[in-house]
Amino acid sequence: MDCKVHMETTVSRPVLSPTHINATASETFTVLQQRMRIVEEQTSSLRDDLIMLDFGEKRGYLEAPDCLEDLDSQKVISPIQNEAICAGKTDILWKNCEFLVNRMCRLESLMQSLKMNIFRLQTEKDLNPQKTAFLKDRLNAIQEEHSKDLKLLHLEVMNLRQQLRAVKEEEDKAQDEVQRLTATLKIASQTKKNAAIIEEELKTTKRKMNLKIQELRRQLAQEKYLRESLEKSASAMLLKIQEMGSTVEVERKQVHILQQNCIALRDSIQSAQELLAQEQKKKEELEIATSQLKSDLTSRDDLISKLVEENKNLQISFNKEHEENAYLRSEIMSLHEASEKAQVLNDQLTKKCSELSCMLQTVTMEKARIIADHQAILQVEQKMMTQTFQEQNLLLDAAHASITNELQTVQNEKTQLQAHLDHLILEHNQCIQKAQDAEKRTAVQKELLESTIARLRGELEASMQEKKSLLEEKERFQREVNKTEKEIVQERCNLEKELAKNKVDINTLTHNLQTLEEENKHLADQMASLELQQVTSDYHGLAQQKVEKITESKNKLAYENGKLQIKVKQLEEQVQSFTDTSLQNDHLRKMNKYLQTKYAQANSELSAKRVHLQQADAHLKEVKSILERSKEELSRTVKCRNAALKESQKLKEDLEAVEDRENKKVGNFQRQLAEAKEDNCKVTIMLENVLASHSKMQGALEKVQIELGRRDSEIAGLKKERDLNQQRVQKLEAEVDQWQARMLVMEDQHNSEIESLQKALGVAREDNRKLAMSLEQALQTNNHLQTKLDHIQEQLESKELERQNLETFKDRMTEESKVEAELHAERIEALRKQFQTERETTKKVAQREVAELKKALDEANFRSVEVSRTNRELRQKLAELEKILESNKEKIKNQKTQIKLHLSAKANNAQNIERMKQIEKELKQMELIKDQYQKKNYEQSLSIQRFVCEMTNLQKEMQMLAKSQYDASVRNKQQELHLEAERKIRQELENRCQELEETVRHLKKCKEATENTLKEASVESEQITANLEEAHRWFKHRFDGLQLELTKNRLQRPSGEDRWQEKDQDVKHDVMSNQSVLHRWERKQNLRPMPKKYHSEVQRK
């Protein structure tokens, strides 16, 4: 009885839970290990007791399997792998510890129940030695049932192991995929950052390109201005040539007047013979002077012959240069086709020429009036000649000295002109070489640009294809997401249906429970009646059998209940993890939608940028049309130049004819003078000397007047040009101000666009950060699931160990029971005698125990019903959780496919980034080429500024020369009053001959200078056109690739029509500004060769 009371106290003691103790993980582990050792010792002792109770016939059930023979050699699995545990894992660890502690408490309670049963069996054997055979049969039946249950459990454990392995493999795969996803997300964020940087760099390059285009426009305006100035200078040259023709006609008239004067002089000679008698003394002195003048004339004739020979040599060289000019003209004819388009400018020039012709007519009228006044003055002077005859002898010496100085100056000019010609020939050769080098460079650059354009087009096509593939993948992802959502909804509906079914099952189970309780009551009544009827021994045996069945069923139910509770907890944790993953998936879907909206916004911004690029293409096309117009204008100017050259050739021929006529006239005059010499001898010689001196003075006066007229006309033209230039400068300044205002507006718009893009980039970065946070959360959940899996695996391994221990214990118990059965067979015979004596005492005890057993039966039945109900619920939950696992596996597979597609898209993005880098390198190379071109243009502008400075200096020198010539003219007038009439006539004839020769030389030199300037202008225009063509080709090839996409986006944006109208107005304004730039450039090109021409003219004067 004392032992019985002790067992009841052990069964009824409360189970201690470890959650009330604030212990560490290591302490809990040691406590659990100690308890496990105690349990193992107790199981070994129970096995020995079973062997003693004759369970030795079937030892195979209690033998340990081969896998558990070396338990000591196996390592103990610790539930704590690392002491440094994250804050999120501590709760899981403590839950696992609590679970293990509860399990150990259950095992202890089970062991205590086993001890009580063994004690009861021992007492029964001691009290009933006759029932050993019955007990052996019962034990064998129990062992068979137990072995069957163990086999079933073993199969379930194997299935669970396989499932756990599959789950573990899938979770490992999921971890790898999550790591890949994190890596891909990081790379995607980096690619987005790189794309943002690339966009900013492209914007900066676009700004630079706009600035460079504006600089080119300014340069074109300057070059247009220069071209206009060159055209004006060419028109001035034509006017000068016309003036020279008019002077030649005037000189012809003067020669006719001189002939008439000669006739009048012959008449006056007859009247002068009467005066010769009085002036014989003066004649002797004059004869001495004439002898000196004859010697001077002979020396002059020699010089004239030398100059004629040099003139012939110059004509030969001129013919050679003429041939070269013909070759150049053949080359220039290719430009005539482009010059046909410049008729508008020619119309303007014709208007200006008509105005200038009107001015010329007025000037000729004034000149005729001046000549009439001059003739009147000459008549007055002829009257005064008789009075000033004595003073002319002194002035002749001064004239002789001045003539010698003039000859020296002529020789110096000749040497300078030859050096200048050599220098021009060298420059011409250098220009030809430069043109050839430039053509080669342009060909090479053209090939490079074509290759780069072809490669860029290929890359554009590839990027478009990649874009299409990405859009298709995006649609596929959306479809898969929709499918998963539908599946989740269907699963929820199925779960709700299963819950309803479970509720119905629970109601049926409760009804069955009630029926079982009623049956138990009925059985209890039957048991009471059987006790009265049957013998106490038979009743005692049946009661014992029923009690044993009840206890065994109770133990089995408790064991299964523990297992099922563990499985339920595990499955609930898995369900929670899957719910977390589903929530994360929902969050990711939301993020995907948000990113899709961002992608649409980025596409719209790209379309806007493409529209801007199309506008830039339109601007470039307009610039190209302006350049073509400028080429046409150039061709027209070249035609005008050729016409001017033809007119200069005609004038040259006319001048040669005039020279021939004048030479003939001079010969006739010489013959007439020879006849006069034969008739009048010395008197005629003296008269001829007087006429020569008078002619020289008159020629000097005419020269001075002509030069003064030219200077006045040049000064007036320069003043007009200055006024026109000032007006154009003002217009250009106004245009510059307008362009600056437009630039400011464009910069503001551009800045606003950049700010919007920066905001969009900031939002995209925040989205990327949110994605990174969500991925980190997913990783944390994945780690949490891994820890749970590890814990489950450890629990399974511990369960397997326990199962193996139980199998070994069962085998041992069977062996011991067999041994004990043999021993009890011997004891039973001895105990039968004792049993008869003790039967009466046991009847009383049995009655008490039957009452207690009835109570225990009622409780056991109630508990068995509850346990069966919970088992069914747990099995249903298991089935549901297995379905959820399968659905989650399918979702994981879908996510894997999505990850693979994302990785492929990422690889394509990396390839696109590499291509963008290559394009950036090529753009940098093109920018370097542009910088070189800008440097060259800057050097040209510096040379133009130097030329302008030289022009101002030359104008100052011309003013000084005009003043000095005016003073010389005043002195010459004073000297002419004192010269004799005969010397004037002779000097006039000689000076006219020299002037004609000088005019011929001057015209030749002007022609050479104009041809050289035209050559230089043509070479420079070719260089500039080549450079502009290169720049245009580059811009055209750069923006042709994007034009198709821009036209597509134009149709999608009808709101941009107003912008196009505004931009068309801007384009028109740009055309006008570009025309002004071309005029400036033409003026610069015309002004470059001017300093040499002016220098030579100054030296001649």
From Swiss-Prot:
Does Coiled coil appear among the keywords? yes
- What positions belong to coiled-coil segments? 106-299, 398-680, 712-940, 970-1033
Q: Where is this region: Disordered?
A: 1055-1101
InterPro entries (alphabetical): CCDC150 (IPR038807)
* Comp. bias regions, Basic and acidic residues: 1055-1071
Q: Which keywords are on file for this protein?
A: Coiled coil
Question: What is this protein's name?
Answer: Coiled-coil domain-containing protein 150
- Which species is the source of this protein? Homo sapiens (Human)
State the encoding gene.
CCDC150
